[in-house]
């Protein structure tokens, strides 16, 4: 249900309408770093347009001045000119296509890199509101749609517009009235285009929304394959949801296909009408000696040269509507301000002691209150366990300390300094999180550990492993540190993945470590090894452990019990057990589990 509500909120937010001119200015502005490439493409396009528009006129000269006049010399001359123009048209089109494709590839690379970097800067609050499939679709499909229109489609539009102007000019020089007759169907062409254009933007926007929802559904099914296969009911629910979204996607695509199916035949019919007018009226002019045969042939050729660009210009409007839907999503995404940024007073600071204080903290998720005036102090260079039922605020405290979120009111202090006065980079370099579900990447175990500190040498990593007493576990792997890791670490046990995640954090040499349910799924042997490592760490670092297991909680120097966002008890394990309060009840429940 929560997933569905997040989806609805995301779709409602995307219904915001950005002015078309704003989007067009932004799209054109994307080309500003590529001025030389654009100039080269304009020169190639101009040469292509000149060769293309002159070719039918030279064909006229071959017929009138060569064949009909019986002048072999002129016939040979104009034929050679015709071949030269055709060759020039072919060469300029080839080079234009190549350079346009190269510009398109470069622009897509820059846009995707920019979008990805922006995604990495956005805060957890924004990312948690979005679907992974929607973001993936934006960075891949939407960026491609925008890039294609800005480069190749935009250049094609310019060529088509200039081809229309050049063709009309030459046609009018040959015969004004026949030119006007050829243009007589233009109002009908414009009218048909405008009728269909009204619906296209929303239709294409809907299709892209459905594609992103379909991507999210597949992604969720892949990630949850183990659960779906274990619970046949869940598999049925996933299948029904996928089928529903897939049917909606089919319906949206059918609507888009219907628009396209109606536009292209309509435009082709109008072109056929224009051709018929030229042949009939032009034929009458030829019989009255008001037009040469060569000119009639040229007019016929110009019809194809003239109306094809008009059809493409009209179609471009529909392509543009599709691209504008994508552009709006990318534009709004890049305009999204990170909720967590460095404040003007932020400095690179060193954490010396590691004492943490939450002072009168108020915090809520989407209007649901978690803390109202929470005051909490965590001693430095000690291990503090946070316990409480689900929803008590344990993980929220971890997120606030890491500054993944900011409190709506109150402060979080480290060594007496508001963490907003630390730069985000310096804070997270010294405060590290070990999550419940470790994320491993394809490569070796050594590569995955080195993510925590790319500068760490193998000798330093081996020393850290030895100091933490984890050498036995690493050596038990098939190739030790050189063991290959499959995507997600699927070839390793949960315990092995968690050990690697733990070591990744430790090579950073953080001053504060937050361990969020990291031992909830590991085996007893791995848990024991991690507990020993934590005890070694606590001598010189501040450790915060969020856990449910009794053995994990018991080794903490101090235990803080949370209930409904408030601290209800704190003290050592033995002290709290003797008090027979909230902790004793929780501990008893944990033992029974």
Which residues does each predicted region cover?
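Alpha-helical segments in transporter systems
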Residues: 25, 36-57, 61, 78, ...
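Short intracellular "coupling" helices and adjacent cytoplasmic loop segments at the cytosolic face
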Residues: 4-15, 69, 105, 113-137, ...
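Hydrophobic/aromatic residues in alpha-helical transmembrane segments
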Residues: 55-59, 96, 115, 166, ...
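Membrane-integrated ABC transporters
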Residues: 1-52, 67-78, 96-100, 104, ...
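An intracellular "coupling" helix at the cytosolic face of ABC transporter transmembrane type-1 domains
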Residues: 124-125, 141-150, 154, 162, ...
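ABC-type nucleotide-binding domain
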Residues: 342-343, 349-593
């Amino acid at each position: 249900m929560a997933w569905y509500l997040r989806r609805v909120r995301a779709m409602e937010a995307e219904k915001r309408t950005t002015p078309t001119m704003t989007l067009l200015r932004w799209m054109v502005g994307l080309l500003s770093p590529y001025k030389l490439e654009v100039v080269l493409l304009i020169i190639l396009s101009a040469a292509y347009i000149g060769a293309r528009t002159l070719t039918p006129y030279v064909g006229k000269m071959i017929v009138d001045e060569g064949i009909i006049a019986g002048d072999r010399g002129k016939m040979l001359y104009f034929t050679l000119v015709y071949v030269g123009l055709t060759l020039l048209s072919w060469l300029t089109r080839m080079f234009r296509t190549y350079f346009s494709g190269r510009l398109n590839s470069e622009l897509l690379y820059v846009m995707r890199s920019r979008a990805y970097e922006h995604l990495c800067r956005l805060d957890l609050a924004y990312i948690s509101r979005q679907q992974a499939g929607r973001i993936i679709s934006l960075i891949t499909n939407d960026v491609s749609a925008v890039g294609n229109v800005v480069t190749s489609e935009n250049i094609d539009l310019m060529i088509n517009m200039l081809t229309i102007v050049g063709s009309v000019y030459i046609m009018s020089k040959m015969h004004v009235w026949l030119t006007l007759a050829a243009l007589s169907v233009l109002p009908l062409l414009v009218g048909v285009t405008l009728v269909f254009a009204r619906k296209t933007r929303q239709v294409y926007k809907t299709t892209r929304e459905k594609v992103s929802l379909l991507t999210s559904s597949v992604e969720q099914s892949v990630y949850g394959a183990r659960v779906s296969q274990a619970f046949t009911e869940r598999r049925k629910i996933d299948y029904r949801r996928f089928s529903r979204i897939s049917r909606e996607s089919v319906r949206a695509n059918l609507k888009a296909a219907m628009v396209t199916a109606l536009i292209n035949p309509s435009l082709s019919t109008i072109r056929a009408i224009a051709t018929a007018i030229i042949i009939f009226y032009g034929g009458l002019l030829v019989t009255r000696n008001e037009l040469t045969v060569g000119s009639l042939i040229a007019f016929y050729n110009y019809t194809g040269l003239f109306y094809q660009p008009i059809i493409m210009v009209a179609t471009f409007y529909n392509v543009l509507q599709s691209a504008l839907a994508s552009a709006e999503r990318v534009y709004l995404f890049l305009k999204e301000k990170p909720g967590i940024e460095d404040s003007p007073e932020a400095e690179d600071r060193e954490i010396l002691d590691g004492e943490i204080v939450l002072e009168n903290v108020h915090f809520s998720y989407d209007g649901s209150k978690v803390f109202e005036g929470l005051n909490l102090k965590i001693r430095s260079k000690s291990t503090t366990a946070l316990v409480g039922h689900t929803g008590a605020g344990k993980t929220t405290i971890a997120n606030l300390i890491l500054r993944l979120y900011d409190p709506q009111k109150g402060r979080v202090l480290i060594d007496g300094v508001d963490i907003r006065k630390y730069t985000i980079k310096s804070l997270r370099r010294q405060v590290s999180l070990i999550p419940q579900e470790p994320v491993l990447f394809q490569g070796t175990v050594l590569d995955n550990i080195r993510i925590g500190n790319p500068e760490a040498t193998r000798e330093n990593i081996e020393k850290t492993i030895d100091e933490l007493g984890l050498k036995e576990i690493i050596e038990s792997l098939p190739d030790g540190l050189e063991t290959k890791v499959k995507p997600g670490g699927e070839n390793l046990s949960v315990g092995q993945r968690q050990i690697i995640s733990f070591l990744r954090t430790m090579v950073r040499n953080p001053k504060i470590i937050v361990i969020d349910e990291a031992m909830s799924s590991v085996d007893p042997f791995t848990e024991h090894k991690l507990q020993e490592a934590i005890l070694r760490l606590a001598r010189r670092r501040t450790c915060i452990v969020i856990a449910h297991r009794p053995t994990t909680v018991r080794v903490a120097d101090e235990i803080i019990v949370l209930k409904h966002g408030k601290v209800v008890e704190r003290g050592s394990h033995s002290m709290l057990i003797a008090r027979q309060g909230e902790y004793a009840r929780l501990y008893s429940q944990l033992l029974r589990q």
